[in-house]
Every structure is written in C-alpha cells, then in structure tokens.
Design a protein with these regions (language model features):
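Paired acidic/hydrophobic, glycine-rich loop segments that form the ligand-binding mouth/hinge
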Residues: 97-106, 245-251, 266-267
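Extracytoplasmic ligand-binding site segments that recognize negatively charged/polar headgroups
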Residues: 51-65, 77-91, 99-236, 240
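Conserved C-terminal helix/tail region of periplasmic/extracytoplasmic solute-binding proteins
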Residues: 33, 341-374
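Periplasmic-binding protein-like
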Residues: 218-222, 227-229, 262-290, 331-334
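A ligand-binding cleft/hinge motif common to bilobed small-molecule-binding domains
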Residues: 111-114, 246-266
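Short, low-complexity disordered leader/linker segments with a strong preference
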Residues: 1-47, 374
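Mature extracytoplasmic/periplasmic domains
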Residues: 282-349
Length: 374
C-alpha cells in the first residue's frame, strides 16, 4: 500500500510538472508583439474609452458599437459633424491644452489643410501593432499615404466615386451618358451640387471636371441654376422627394436612408469621361498626446484589420484597399473598389486626395468655385 501511495504521489508530481511545463511553453510561445498587444488592450480597458471623429452615419455608429465595443470592452465616443467644424474644434482645443480627441477618420482635404499644417499629428505607422495591419502584403498597393511625408495620413480606402445620383422617376440614366448632357435646358433647376467651396466630395468632383472639361464648362454648369448646399441630408432628401433630378457630390451613405426606405434614388452609371478615384472617408490620423493612447492604438488596429475594414466599408458603401476583404458587392450600389478595376499605376494617375493633388488641382478648383459662386 505504501508503495502504491509512493508511486501515486510520484505520478501526481510528474503530472503537475508536465502541466507547468505546458503552461510555460504556451507563455513563451506568445510572440513579444502578441504579449504587448494583450497589455495594450488591458491598459485600454482601464482608460475606458476612445474619442473618434468620424463621418455622419447611423449605420457606422451602430456597426462600431456591435463589433468594436463588444469585442474589446472599450467605449467609443464618436464625434460627428461637418469636417471643417469638427477639425477646427480639434485644433482650437489642442492649442488651448485640452486633450480630448484621440483620432480622426474622414476625408483627406480637411486633414491636409487643417491638421497637418498645425503639427498636431503623430505618425500612424508606430501605432500599427497587429501583423495583419502593418504587413503591406495585406494591402492593395501596399501602404498608401496621403501626405507627402508618408507618415501622418493613412489612406485605407480607394474606389471609383459614386458621387452622381439620380431620381429614377425624373431621369433615365441613358439621358446622361456624358457630363455635357448636364448642360441641356431640361435639367435647368433640377441639379444639386455639394458646395465645392468647402472640402469634400463636391470639391473633388468639381476639380475633376475642371481638369477634364475646363473652366468654360463649369461656367455653363453654374448657369444651370443648380441648388448648391452644404447640408448633405437636405440635398439627398430633395433628390428622393423629386425636387431634384440629379445630385452631384454625395456618396452612398448620404442616400442610403432614402434608398432603404424604398424611395426612387440610384447611383448614375459612370459617364463616358470616366471619374476620379477617391479615398472617401477612410483617411486615418492620430493626434499627438492623445487622451487615451492605448485605446487609440486598439481602435487603429481594429479599424485597419480585416474585420474593421469590412465593417467600415459596408457601413459607408466605400471600397477598402485590403486584399482579404470582399468588395465586389459594392457594384450593386454603383461603387467600384480600385483594387477590382484599375492597376496601382492607374490609381496614382486618377487619385485626387493626396496632399500634392490637393495643393494643385483642388486649390485651383476651389478658387474658381469661389469666383463663380460668390
């Protein structure tokens, strides 16, 4: 009996030793990066929240709550509004010593003109922790940056713009196969345009038309008595209710509530002159000295991950550059991801959101818009 107990205790000792060895091996098998990621999540949960400036979209807010907040246990405090207003607030608060915002995701022009010159941004790449995020092989075109320094404004999306939408009861898409068709008398007073004097897709389309059609064309277009506004919802509502036949410069998410409600709005097939490639609302910047540095890092890595890009792309109807995220479904809403339609070389020729393009083509377009519209 004593011998049995002796062997039994020896067996238990060996079993415990093996278990400890397995645990130690499992712990050592964790890469340093994974260990640091776990610690970052733990610290982020203690911070409790991340403050993100994002585009106005109820679908996006709901998707972030469903996927990010439940996954990581970190609250997201979204700040929404017109980019020019929100970014001005970010600059003013930062200069006064207030550290409230952690990061901003939106269009490129506001970031280039408002945040970049003020020196308020930290490089994005050091915040990329997950291998699936920082390895360029997961991204069509590799890592693409908006700013000339290729450090501060990361471009996660690239798609051919869906910025022409029409009311199916007032316009047959075959009637507008060229931008020249918009100059016909029948469309006078029936066209809406997102104000090209302010940063956004209205300015993007306007500068593209200046490039391919020239100043005289834009003079004639202005003569069509267009409804020009900065309220995207109001423009989309006027289209859905039949007050306008066509609206220029609004993306899918502006029209989505009306489309989902069964109102007669659709994206217009691309005119024969083609269209520019947009980075949409997918430009990411991180603030210097963020209030919640760990929560910021967790959000950045989730946003740039396969899951985050799929969620963001579907909520806004814009095409991600991630190669492992399906974007073919976007064609159903009149959007084509750049990775599904053009080469990387063509992208650099057609894109219009880089700092260089903003300082040349967009600045010229904005100056002409102010001249013709004021």
């Amino acid at each position: 009996m004593r011998a049995f107990r002796k062997h039994f205790h020896l067996w238990l000792f060996c079993l415990a030793s093996c278990a400890n060895a397995v645990c130690a091996a499992a712990q050592s098998a964790k890469s340093p990066g994974q260990t640091e990621w776990d610690k970052t999540i733990e610290r982020a949960r203690k911070e409790g929240r991340v403050v993100v400036s994002i585009t106005t979209s109820n679908d996006l807010r709901a998707a972030i709550e469903k996927h990010f907040e439940r996954k990581y246990g970190i609250d997201v405090e979204p700040v929404i509004g017109r980019a020019a207003v929100v970014l001005r607030k970010m600059v003013d608060e930062y200069k006064s010593g207030v550290r409230y915002f952690d990061l901003h995701i939106g269009g490129s022009e506001s970031a280039v003109n408002s945040l970049l010159p003020e020196g308020l941004l930290d490089p994005v790449e050091p915040t990329m922790m997950l291998p699936e995020v920082k390895d360029p092989k997961h991204w069509w075109g590799g890592h693409i940056w908006t700013d000339n320094a290729k450090r501060f404004i990361y471009s996660s999306l690239a798609h051919q713009s869906e910025s022409l939408w029409y009311n199916t009861q007032l316009l047959n898409p075959q009637e507008v196969r060229s931008f020249d068709d918009l100059l016909l008398d029948k469309w006078k007073g029936k066209i809406g345009l997102l104000d090209p004097r302010t940063p956004g897709s209205g300015a993007s389309l306007w500068s593209y038309l200046l490039d391919i059609k020239g100043e005289e064309y834009l003079r004639k277009l202005v003569g069509q008595q267009m409804l020009i506004g900065r309220d995207q919802r109001l423009l989309a509502e006027n289209l859905a209710k039949g007050k306008l036949a066509l609206v220029m410069g609004l993306g899918y998410y502006s029209h989505a509530p009306f489309k989902k409600a069964g109102l007669p709005v659709l994206a217009l097939p691309t005119p024969k002159e083609g269209t520019y490639i947009s980075g949409g609302s997918g430009h990411l910047v991180v603030m210097k000295q963020p209030a919640n540095p760990n929560a910021m890092r967790v959000f950045v890595n989730w946003f740039l991950s396969k899951e985050g890009q799929d969620v963001y792309s579907r909520a806004l109807g814009q095409g991600t550059r991630r190669l492992d995220v399906d974007t073919h479904w976007l064609r159903e809403i009149g959007v084509i991801a750049a990775k599904d339609s053009v080469s990387v070389e063509q992208y650099y020729r057609l894109e219009n959101q880089s700092e260089n393009k903003i300082n040349t083509a967009r600045e010229a377009g904005a100056a002409l818009a102010r001249k013709l519209l004021e």
